[in-house]
Swiss-Prot record:
Induction: Part of the brxA-brxB-brxC-pglX operon. BREX systems (bacteriophage exclusion) provide immunity against bacteriophage. Part of a type 1 BREX system. This system allows phage adsorption but prevents phage DNA replication, without degradation of the phage DNA. Methylation of bacterial DNA by PglX probably guides self/non-self discrimination. When the brxA-brxB-brxC-pglX and pglZ-brxL operons are transformed into a susceptible B.subtilis strain (BEST7003) they confer resistance to bacteriophages SPbeta, SP16, Zeta, phi3T and SP02 and partial protection to phages SP01 and SP82G (these include lytic and temperate phage). Belongs to the BrxB family. Pfam families: BrxB. The keyword Lipid metabolism does not apply. It comes from Bacillus cereus (strain H3081.97). Coiled coil: none annotated. The keyword tRNA-binding does not apply. This is BREX protein BrxB. Keywords: Antiviral defense. InterPro entries: BrxB. GO terms for biological process: defense response to virus.
Length: 192
């Protein structure tokens, strides 16, 4: 298994390659990628994302558009006036109630999923979408759910999910312990 620094150093050359930005896989599959990593490297991965954004900020041909799913969720709840209500309601009715209420408020399993809409409204043609905050937003937003819903909506630009856990081309295992539903449409961004 290769070291995390070696894998991180391969991301920038990969995402700036023209074939990556054409956004098609082997059989013209949509360009969804997962960069999985040991959760203990979370801060290192976050720092490297900032580094890549800095390196590309003067390149007009492409732009990294990062969506921290946790921050997106908070912003949507705040805009809808639900954030403080959720905090108050959690104290009265408990975490399980709020978990379900928040999922419903975000419409996570419907055709008008608010997180997906938030992302699609902001994606531009020269973007490479980075999804972060996967661990922070669990269990409210599940990895496979957001990927499945985005698959229908973001098909014109490459998307990379930074995943604190393991992905073997079929199973997403958050934190190396929590098995999510299977997801088989994404490619491994950088081999381990």
């Amino acid at each position: 298994m290769r070291r995390i620094n070696e894998r991180l150093d391969e991301i920038l050359p990969k995402i700036t390659d023209a074939s990556f930005r054409e956004n098609k896989g082997l059989g013209n599959e949509i360009g969804f990628y997962i960069f999985d990593y040991d959760p203990k490297y979370e801060m290192l991965v976050r720092e490297h994302i900032v580094y890549m954004q800095e390196r590309l900020k003067n390149d007009s041909s492409l732009h990294i558009r990062e969506f921290d799913l946790y921050e997106v969720m908070l912003e949507i709840l705040e805009e809808k006036g639900y954030l403080q209500k959720n905090i108050d309601m959690e104290q009265k009715k408990g975490s399980d109630f709020i978990l379900n209420a928040t999922r419903k408020a975000l419409r996570l399993t419907s055709n008008n999923d608010l997180v997906v809409q938030y992302i699609t409204d902001r994606v531009q043609p020269n973007d490479i979408v980075f999804l972060t905050g996967v661990g922070k937003v669990f269990p409210i937003i599940r990895s496979h759910t957001i990927l499945n819903n985005l698959h229908k909506a973001v098909d014109n630009v490459p998307l990379v999910m930074f995943f604190p856990g393991t992905y073997d081309g079929l199973e997403l295992v958050l934190f190396g312990e929590i098995k999510d539903d299977n997801y088989y449409r994404a490619f491994q961004l950088i081999d381990k």
